Amino acid sequence: MINLAYDDNGTGDPVVFIAGRGGAGRTWHPHQVPAFLAAGYRCITFDNRGIGATENAEGFTTQTMVADTAALIETLDIAPARVVGVSMGAFIAQELMVVAPELVSSAVLMATRGRLDRARQFFNKAEAELYDSGVQLPPTYDARARLLENFSRKTLNDDVAVGDWIAMFSMWPIKSTPGLRCQLDCAPQTNRLPAYRNIAAPVLVIGFADDVVTPPYLGREVADALPNGRYLQIPDAGHLGFFERPEAVNTAMLKFFASVKA
C-alpha cells in the first residue's frame, strides 16, 4: 500500500467513506461527516490512489485500490467496519466485500453498478480518448459537461443553486493526470453481478433518479444480486445526489446502519 492521506474523526463505531473518481476524502466533509459524527460514529475519509494528497500514482487497477482500502482498515484495526461508497468508491466497496468479507460489517453503495451497459461503455471509451488525446477543454465547457452529467433537472433549473456550482466548477476545472486516467478504468470490465451473490453483509443500495452516469436501474441490479441487499431511490437527484439531497441521503444511511449489527 502507498501512503494514503486520510482523516480520522470521532470515537464511535467506525465508518469508512470511499470517494468516487476524482473525488478526494474531503468530498464527504460538507454533509456526511458532520451528520455521522453527530450520530456518534467515527468517520474515516481518505484520498484514493491517484488523487488529492495521496501520491499521484499511475499504472494501478481496481484490485490495487481495493487492496489500499483493505490495508487502511487493517492498519487502523477497525475491522469489520461499516463502509460507504459512491460511484467508483461503491464499486471498490463491492469488490472489497468479494475478496475480504471479514473487513466489512455492512455497507451503503450509492450511484453504483455491477456492469456497464452499452451507453456507459461508450461514455467511458469517449472519456478515455479525451484524456489520451491530451486535449484540455476550456474551463467553462468542462464545467458545462460536469453540470449536465452530475445534477438533476431540479438543480439545473434553479438559478441560485446552479449558480454556485457554475462558479465552483469554473474555478476548479478537472486537470488530466495519470492517476485520474487510471481511475477511469476502475469500473466493471465484465459483468460482476454473479460474484455479488456471495456477499453476505447487509447492504443498502441508493440510486439517484436523475443519474445519467450510473442510472438507477444498474444500482437496482446490484441490490437484487446481493443476498441481503436493499434498494432505495432518491428523487430530484443526479450522480452527485449526496450533495444535492444530503438530508435525505444521510437520513437513509443512518437509519440503515442503525438497523443492522456492527
Swiss-Prot record:
UniProt keyword list: Oxidoreductase, Peroxidase
Keyword Oxidoreductase: yes
GO cellular component: a single term: membrane
Residues that, per the record, bind substrate: R21, S87, M88, R120, H239
A Pfam match: Abhydrolase_1
Quaternary data: Homodimer.
Family, per entry: Belongs to the AB hydrolase superfamily.
Name this protein carries in UniProt: Putative non-heme bromoperoxidase BpoC
Organism: Mycobacterium tuberculosis (strain ATCC 25618 / H37Rv)
